[in-house]
Amino acid sequence: MKNINPTQTKAWKALETHFAANKDRQLSELFAADPARFDKFSTTYKDNILVDYSKNLITDETLDLLIDLAHEVDLRSAIDAMFNGEKINHTEGRAVLHTALRNRSNRPVMVDGKDVMPEVNAVLAKIKAFCDSVISGEWKGYTGKAIQHVVNIGIGGSDLGPVMITEALRPFKNHLQMHFVSNVDGTHIAETLKNVDPETTLFLVASKTFTTQETMTNALSARDWFVNIAGDQAHVAKHFAALSTNTKAVAEFGIDTANMFEFWDWVGGRYSSWSAIGMPIALSLGFENFEALLEGAFEMDTHFATTSYEQNIPVLLALIGLWYNNFYEAESEAILPYDQYMHRFAAYFQQGNMESNGKYVDRNGNKVDYQTGPIIWGEPGTNGQHAFYQLMHQGTKLIPCDFLAPAITHNPIGDHHPKLLANFFAQTEALAFGKSKEAVEAEFLAAGKTLEQVKDLVPFKVFEGNRPTNSILFKQMTPQTLGALIAMYEHKIFVQGIIWNIFSFDQWGVELGKQLANKILPELNSDAAVTSHDSSTNGLINTWKAWKA
């Protein structure tokens, strides 16, 4: 990959000039000037996902210049490098091949001269056999009962993805009851264990190294709870499986290594749901639906790798997002799914985006002098409308938003879905076009008020509009559709990282806090006052010691 400061490119400088000339243009003006704007600035993917980006503060020239930027930083070679297994995770010396995990074409993918696909397919076959055994009831616990509950113990990428996907695809779930434990706060494991029966519970311990502090603390507590009731350490083998690569530690824990499911160092945590980390997904939905999830992502991978930038959905979304982040100085993006099943979707891509592109050092090791990754947040509609949309409509911050919704619901109860979609359609219209002072006054006049009576109220009811949004309407939530949506956002994040000239696949920012926590933990086991830190940290620790006594 080339190391190019984007702000020094011809395209960036042209974008600065273009922005200065167009920053005050109104969406209402752009739509009025071009009746075909929706047709021009929307695209349908596989007759299943409509991406409408017409309500953005862009023109043909804006997109042309943004695409010029993608060419000038040589995005094409970066895409090829990722798919071809080059070690683009430079700081860790690793390839980045979550795409190989869902490579349904079985095209050879080489890492260090070796095709990884035979191993990928072998692990998938092992996952399928395990899932089929558990789901069918063939797998028995220590008292001969079939498994009814599955507890996934992981954190970060070993938790967020499986939680989000199993929730988003709940209409496809089977009889197994899924539980997820991530927080090292003992409350999380304690409350979960209240709801399961050791005779019918399978624990999945998801940690590549089998040393992750939070995960192993929870796993050891779960094992102690289980052995205390089951009465025999040997029974652990029938109730625990590992998603890991540390054979020695897995065996020492008491797990049969035949029930250890491996993945590779070229799988990043936040991209690992396609690997053995996706075991709870396959257990909850059945392996066939897990395969459909992979298929959907693979099809989006193919679209991303082969489609011209002008029609390439992840590239277009990335470029439009960069336009706001780096030129309009927007600090955040909201992801707003109008689908209750997708209630963890924004949280999942909060990690996916902020852990990937929350970097202030470029690929040359220099501090950047431009903005990189945005803050990602969001909640499902319509809940968010009664929480934070006030600021989106009338606040002082520009917040580009992605609105997502299924055309067809899995729960056709009365007129719930038409009401949900009425809000989905209304919000992007309201954000784009607002309500003028004249329109507010006309409403009051129509209600029999005089302008003199309402003059003090009018300013508060004006909506400026010109708030940009993408609308992503899909036919119905299915495993294949969700796979495509996840891959779409993954590739959007990748494209932005390439243009910003940062490494998107490491996460050194999580290390310092962990190191300090490991230093502080022994200090908490002593009653002596702590003086080795700054006055604030010393004061916090010593107050805790006094209060817990």
Swiss-Prot record:
GO MF annotations in UniProt: carbohydrate derivative binding; glucose-6-phosphate isomerase activity; monosaccharide binding
Taxonomic lineage from the root: Bacteria, Pseudomonadati, Pseudomonadota, Gammaproteobacteria, Aeromonadales
Family membership: Belongs to the GPI family.
Enzyme Commission numbers on file: 5.3.1.9
Organism: Tolumonas auensis (strain DSM 9187 / NBRC 110442 / TA 4)
Record keyword Cytoplasm present: yes
Pathway of action: Carbohydrate biosynthesis; gluconeogenesis; Carbohydrate degradation; glycolysis; D-glyceraldehyde 3-phosphate and glycerone phosphate from D-glucose: step 2/4
Top EC class for this record: isomerase
Keyword Transferase annotated: no
The protein's role, per its UniProt record: Catalyzes the reversible isomerization of glucose-6-phosphate to fructose-6-phosphate.
NCBIfam families in alphabetical order: PRK00179.1
Annotated localization: Cytoplasm
Catalysed reactions listed for this entry: alpha-D-glucose 6-phosphate = beta-D-fructose 6-phosphate
UniProt superkingdom: Bacteria
CDD domains the UniProt entry points to: SIS_PGI_1 (cd05015), SIS_PGI_2 (cd05016)
Catalytic residues of the enzyme: E355, H386, K514
Keywords assigned by UniProt, alphabetized: Cytoplasm, Gluconeogenesis, Glycolysis, Isomerase
Name of the molecule in the record: Glucose-6-phosphate isomerase
